[in-house]
């Protein structure tokens, strides 16, 4: 068989097969199998590379997306099978995530709710609307606590619901109002005209401060708040915190010997999340690249 392959460019295939006694069907089956094995070997190599480049954070869905970005064709069953053989798997999310809360006594309506009246059943329900058509239409914010032996850090970010980008953030050793104003200042410095934007939050005390209301009002930003005790009203932000903690914090708490180390890891993760971490919602692209491509199409 090897001789037939090597001499194929110099002699007619039918002659080589007749002399060697190899059947035509056998020859093509073997050639196709070798080609397939070579392709599988390359895909296996790519899967391992993607997995380790992302520190084991990707499961089969994101690995499949990234394979497509790199020009490789495969289906989810194949990727799952190869990952199983390699003994690698993505991070399994922990249970329901709850962000840091504080005193709550809401003062604003939830602008992300739509009232739905079913006259036939005499029933009224409310549907959440996180949909957008461009960046800077709907932002959301919240505060999350990171607790290690050395103490606590609090992360306060703003997330754009369109491309899931972290627009700005602040890491502090206490959840004070200076943290909130710093986060706002960074976001406003990045973007000029934000008139009409909805900025959503829970009913945390920070978002009820007079200065906070005034800063939003001055820029034509509409303030929105979740209903009391209803974390699903702010699920895009809650989901981000859950993903972040599953990927860089849970199970690694004891690796951080100081708050400075933890803060560096938080900053590094957000940089990674914005610039490298792909997701299905953003068509297999990281948030910032998705925004840039959308911007070119006049979407952001």
Over which residues does each language-model region extend?
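Basic, flexible linker segments flanking DNA-binding modules
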Residues: 1, 24-133, 230, 286-295
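Active-site beta-loop-alpha junctions of metal-dependent nucleic acid enzymes
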Residues: 147, 151, 170-192
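C-terminal domain-tail junction helix/linker
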Residues: 217-221, 243-300
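RNase H-like two-metal-ion nuclease catalytic core shared by retroviral integrases
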Residues: 99-103, 201-203, 209-212, 223-245, ...
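Short, flexible loop/turn motifs enriched in small residues
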Residues: 10-13, 134, 148-154
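Short, acidic, Ser/Thr-enriched surface-loop or helix-capping motifs
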Residues: 148, 160-161
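Mobile genetic element proteins and their domesticated derivatives, centered on retroelements
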Residues: 16-20, 27, 47, 63, ...
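Residue-centric detector for conserved, function-critical "anchor" positions
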Residues: 1-10, 15, 37
